[in-house]
A protein has these predicted regions:
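Positively charged n-region of N-terminal signal peptides that target proteins for export
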Residues: 1-5
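Bacterial N-terminal signal peptides
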Residues: 6-17
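Extracytoplasmic metal-acquisition and chelation regions
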Residues: 21-318
Length: 318
């Protein structure tokens, strides 16, 4: 992406940013997810652009609509003063931030961080939510969504999101194009370094094959070259003794070391995994994110990517 080329935005004249005077408030950009927040903070470092997540301490995406709806009166001044929102709505219609912000401020710009408004720009790679693939999983749960939601867990997608956000930030704030461009390159290098380091460690640890009790991490496994031997997706309370026995047998027969999940499951499931000599690894989808002192961590996305990969590598080496 050539950041020197400032993209033409609809109604650009409305949003031209004057030079900051002594009493002028710095530009404000809003986000609603950890991924959007971390990427936007990284891209605007060293500029006067302020980035604020709504709310500051984060919310699960599924709860964000209710949170904003109940506080619309108190949030309206924030929406009115903001120049842009970094949203994921085109990929995840459940992201409500831009809709509420626009209700308060018709001039606010929607920076789409996943599926861009431009008809010529590619978006992030999206995958379908996995379903159970094992022979014994005939009564497994159906996925809640067709498109798997946590696409920021792919380093490739995180980089693409950075590209998309940076391009629109440059269009909105051309005076800071050089700094944003430098920040983008720094962000890309750090993410590529992280992926390269862990790909080597995963190969060395023998953790190139995993079994999944959730479909939430399809982007992570695809991006890191991890082969998912099988999926079995079923609420804990619905597991039968036959399910537990079948899981243990499958893990043992296929010498699988690592089983990934999105939460700590029931004791019975944990015992079924350990009986096969495998390790259960609970991963973080980044929703709502990393909260430190009642605020999302600026580098929360990077922390989550590293934490997840560390957990898989450590489990495989035990």
């Amino acid at each position: 992406m050539k950041l020197e080329r400032v993209a033409i935005l609809v109604g650009a004249a409305w949003f031209a940013q004057p030079a900051l005077g002594a009493d002028a408030a710095p530009p404000l950009v809003l986000t609603g997810t950890q991924a959007a927040y971390s990427l936007t903070v990284a891209l605007t470092a060293g500029t006067p652009i302020q980035v604020q997540n709504v709310p500051a301490d984060g919310r699960q995406l599924a709860l964000l609509k209710d949170y904003i709806e109940r506080r619309m009166d108190s949030l309206t001044p924030t929406f009115v003063s903001a120049t842009a929102v970094v949203s994921l709505t085109n990929a995840l219609p459940g992201d409500p931030l831009y809709r509420f912000a626009r209700e308060a401020n018709i001039r606010i710009v929607d920076i789409e961080a996943a599926v861009p408004w431009s008809i010529n720009a590619p978006g992030v790679g999206l995958a379908e939510t996995p379903t159970s693939t094992v022979a014994w999983g005939k009564d497994a749960d159906s996925p809640e969504t067709v498109v798997a939601p946590y696409f920021w867990l792919s380093v490739s997608n995180a980089i693409r999101m950075g590209d998309l956000v940076a391009e629109d930030l440059v269009a909105l704030f051309p005076d800071h194009a050089a700094v944003i461009g430098t920040n983008l390159e720094t962000l890309k290098r750090s993410l590529l370094k992280l992926r390269g380091e862990y790909q080597d460690r995963l190969i060395d640890s023998g953790a190139d094959v995993v079994f999944a009790l959730t479909g939430d991490f399809v982007y992570l496994t695809n991006d890191m070259g991890l082969y998912v031997d099988g999926y079995f997706i079923k609420q804990d309370v619905r597991w039968t003794d036959a399910d537990l026995a079948a899981l243990t047998k499958h893990l043992r027969d296929n010498a699988i070391k690592v089983v990934i999940h999105k939460w700590q499951p029931s004791e019975a499931i944990q015992k079924a995994v350990s009986a096969a000599g495998a390790k259960l690894v609970v991963l973080d989808a980044g929703d709502p994110g990393v909260v430190v002192e009642r605020a999302l961590a600026k580098d929360g996305l990077q922390q989550i990517l590293k934490k997840n990969l560390d957990a898989i590598v450590v489990a495989a080496g035990e």
